Amino acid sequence: AAFALSGTLDEEYARLSWMYGVKPATLHLLAMRHAYFGTELAAQALEFGKGEAKRLGYDSLRMDTCREDERMLALFKGQMTREAGSITFEDNALAYACFEAPLSEHCPMLPIRMHPAYRFGEMTPWGGEQLRSVYHKQIPDERTGEALEISAIPKLESVSDAGETLGELIAKNGARLTGKGAEDEFPLLLKLLAAREPLSVQVHPGDAYAKEHEHKLGKTEAWVILNAEPGASILYGMKEGVTLDGLREALKSGEDIEPMIERVNVQNGDVFYMPSGMVHAIGAGILLYEIQQSSDVTYRLWDYNRRNAAGELRPLHITQSLDVIDLGLHGARARMPEVGGNELVNLLRVPAFGLDCACVNGELELEANAGGFRMVTALAGLLLSWQG
């Protein structure tokens, strides 16, 4: 058997989203005499090639094989970590499958571009088409309320360029991807939310209540207002003097409880923190970025008597809401900074997550997040680049 190792990557490889290594090697032309087919020699040669690449200082191995070669496809699928996609060469019309593998447990991972799952239609009757008009997303419905950009929520998982769900990526890579706590449930959910109409007045439970009653994480969240129409506002915490008994009576009688809640006008760049237990609602005409715990537990207190296509009211969760509401919570606010120099500005740091704004006037280098992971969102005018 024979093969060639090289530290030079074919230009065709640049079209793919690779996942491992900042110093990759390429294995070319793995060949063997026909008499040795079926003897496991090719598998041994591939393992030997990995060892040689590691000995020469490379941290990952990449290779390709013709999609019509079923024998080599089976070998690479069995012994390489992942399939990165397909390429073609100018002098050859055939398609080639590309594979890669890290060469040690310390091999760094490259950024993984994720594609969202959507909540739309009757799931988000308040949704609109702003995700398409502002961010050119291929939304599935004119009432699309949420693009779940990084999500491990069952049946609403985001996927990589290669079609791998976030859950599959975590199962395959563990701590290499998520850092400490890789064996635990993925803790965060990142989404873009577009509200054509007001969302329901709602509250989310903390971890203890959610675990006991829903068998899920609680929900603490933060918003960054990306696009607000003139006069847009949110409901943000209960007014002073409101009592739990008074709120209970209003809810049981079907009274509109908006007058009991603080209303805040919003502008592009406003940042709002909502701890679990704080009553809130997003108003009409708002497009926002949301970072939250990975939970879909929402208790609706009031939904404006909104009905679906069948004429049915959406269910309210009065008992659960009253169990978890903390009338004294008023959140925290911040503003996105004006871009001056190149710096990473902290907007919020709470036990569940941190929220930073990368101010870039030219170029900004982000250090590795040792022991954890980062979710990076380029909202406008930024190019993310990395070695490897």
Region spans (language model):
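Conserved acyl-donor/pantetheine-binding loop and adjacent beta-alpha core of acyl/acetyltransferases
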Residues: 2-29, 33-37
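Transition-metal
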Residues: 104-242, 303-330, 355
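Conserved GNAT acetyl-CoA-binding A-motif
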Residues: 53-65
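Conserved acetyl-CoA-binding loop-helix of GNAT-fold acetyltransferases
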Residues: 32, 38-51, 55, 74, ...
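Conserved metal-binding segment of the jelly-roll/cupin
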Residues: 201-204, 266-284, 293, 388
